Amino acid sequence: MLSTRNKRIGTVVGAAIITAVALTGCAGNSSSDSAAAGSGSGTWAKTEGTLVFGATPDQAGSDSNNKPLEDYIAKETGYKVEYYPTSDYTALIAAAVAGKVDLMSSGALQYVMAQNKGAELSAVAATLTSADVTDPGYYSEAIVAKGSSITSLADAKGKTVCFVDPNSTSGFLFGLYQLKQAGLSVDSTGADANGNPTFADFTAYFAGAHDKSEQAVASKQCDLGFAEDSVVTPAVAKGEVTSINKQYVPGGPLSISTTLPDDVKTKLTSVLQGATLDAIKSSGVTLTDGFTKGYFGAQKEADDYYAPVRDLCSSIPAGKCAK
């Protein structure tokens, strides 16, 4: 039976229990507040008074897609915000581990992997995926080309399967979980020339982005593939692909550096937890088409919300995300 949006991933991994911890924060500060750097001890990724923002490059135009949120954070905190460009998921994780970002918008898997590698980050909120939901979770969907003879994940054996990236939450880890549930072996048998994992029961192809995974399936470059629901839903509506399975995934975290001065962390936490779409629109920042199509606000969440992802990492070694 498919998961419903209100059925959190804790049920997927059995004993995992999600505890949403309310973080204490004071009221948001507007741009009229002093832009002075935070007081007390702490370190910044680049320079005092500048927040460096890292984001998952999972679709084309990621910088433009995140610009309104960056501008909103700058306006509400009084600090300068700079975007840290990364070419792929691995680069974002490396930047977080190296302490080159002060805040990060990512998938749950990148967050967990970065922490496991030593990144000093803590989630304070999770992003919503639709205007009509209050749960930040979303779905990893299994898709086939329109008219495909494949009707279940069990049919994927011996086929070419499109994934997004080995470090993708919904585009890889939760795709492997769905295949495992269908009876396929998801134990890696080695690595290809690019260092990506290989499997005995199917041929893995890594498209590099969610939209590219969908496009590869639609063009029949792959027999089956995985992508997040925000990409799949419009593709299904256009008649490009058919969704044959889906699995709930904890929403992508907005995380902040734990090394920032305490007052900066408090201010930034308050701003991120209050970053609704209405609040951003009302602030007067310029919106972009990519942003309004993909950002629907954030909900307060904490690190414990992602405990089930860590459990799934432990049960699927090919994910290479266990600590």
Could you describe each region identified by the protein language model?
Residues 121-135, 236-249:
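Short beta-strand->loop
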Residues 92-98, 108-131:
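Acidic/His-rich segments in extracytoplasmic proteins that coordinate ligands and/or metal ions
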Residues 1-24:
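Sec-dependent bacterial lipoprotein signal peptides
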